[in-house]
Amino acid sequence: MRRVSMRSLKRYLKAIWDLLRLEHGLMYGFGVVIGIYVSDPFFSDLWKLLLGYLTAVFLQASTFALNDYFDYEVDLVNNRTDRPLVRGDLSRRIALALAIALMPPGFVAAYLISPLAFIFAFAVSVLACLYDYKLKELGFAGNVYIAFTMAAPFLFGSIISSGWITEKTALLASMAFLTGVGREIMKGIEDVEGDALRDVRSLARTMGERKAASIASLFYLTAVSISPIPLFLLPEFLFDLKYAVPVSVTDVLLIYVALRLVGDYERESIRKYRKVTLVAMVLGLVGFFAGAF
């Protein structure tokens, strides 16, 4: 009996983790830390750093729970067994309750940092709710929003440490944004059947999967094209191997995906390529963080 109970508890906790996508929250929090130190390598207020990290984790978890609440029927059609609601491990009511409960702590943490930090966090969260409810159906506009959320942690970090968005952070955010748009267009290809249920106007549905894949490739190549800029224009990164080496690997991975997408945009391939781009983004974060010191 005890063994069964422990197994049930582990399954429940895993379902909560999967619903909230806490691995993404940890990465978003790390993005805030990177934004802080890319903007100001000598930042020393650990209390604000912790608050910034918690803001990202709480708000990200809340919006992912809300996303699964609204996307339940689409995820069923797409057979998204990685989603706990589809597996039956959690109810939609629990997902909605968690979405509502986790947002206020994120706002409180942001408010304790500064008024500007609170305004930024609140605005991003409002957009997140609109996206989960309706913006997603607008297709490319929704892709742009999600890509912005990938860049937002760096901008938020810069606001925490410098009170504004620095050039260094803006470049980092731009690369994250461009890569994020590519990833979201690919997700539209992967989810094209389920998106028909909500009449999501993704590029894959409005222009065809082949053209959508080509556009995603273009965004990846654009991200690669701006990655050398810090090496030549920002004094802190001038010919810095700590930045150049990991970012070069990032570029190679993104170029690989961009070239493969032109002729291979099957569902299974898209899933694999999205994982490759996630690795590329993590390496890019490492490069910017290392180059800041």
Curated annotation (Swiss-Prot):
Q: Name one GO biological process term.
A: glycerophospholipid biosynthetic process
Q: What is the lineage of its organism?
A: Archaea, Methanobacteriati, Methanobacteriota, Archaeoglobi, Archaeoglobales
What Enzyme Commission number(s) does the record list for this chain? 2.5.1.42
Compartments, record wording:
Cell membrane
Instruction: Please report which protein family the annotation says this sequence is part of.
Output: Belongs to the UbiA prenyltransferase family. DGGGP synthase subfamily.
Source organism of the structure: Archaeoglobus fulgidus (strain ATCC 49558 / DSM 4304 / JCM 9628 / NBRC 100126 / VC-16)
Work out whether the entry's keyword set contains Cell membrane: yes
Cross-referenced NCBIfam families, in alphabetical order?
Answer: PRK12884.1
Role description? Prenyltransferase that catalyzes the transfer of the geranylgeranyl moiety of geranylgeranyl diphosphate (GGPP) to the C2 hydroxyl of (S)-3-O-geranylgeranylglyceryl phosphate (GGGP). This reaction is the second ether-bond-formation step in the biosynthesis of archaeal membrane lipids.
TM segment ranges: 26-46, 50-70, 107-127, 140-160, 215-235, 237-257, 273-293
Q: Identify which top EC class this enzyme belongs to.
A: transferase
InterPro entries to which the protein is assigned, alphabetical: DGGGP_synth (IPR023547), Prenyltransferase_related (IPR050475), UbiA_prenyltransferase (IPR000537), UbiA_sf (IPR044878)
Which catalysed reactions does the entry list for this protein? Answer: sn-3-O-(geranylgeranyl)glycerol 1-phosphate + (2E,6E,10E)-geranylgeranyl diphosphate = 2,3-bis-O-(geranylgeranyl)-sn-glycerol 1-phosphate + diphosphate
Q: What is its main location?
A: membrane
According to its record, how does it sit in the membrane? Multi-pass membrane protein
This one is known as Digeranylgeranylglyceryl phosphate synthase
Q: In which pathway does it act?
A: Membrane lipid metabolism; glycerophospholipid metabolism
What cellular component terms from Gene Ontology apply here? Answer: plasma membrane
Cofactor(s) named in the record: Mg(2+)
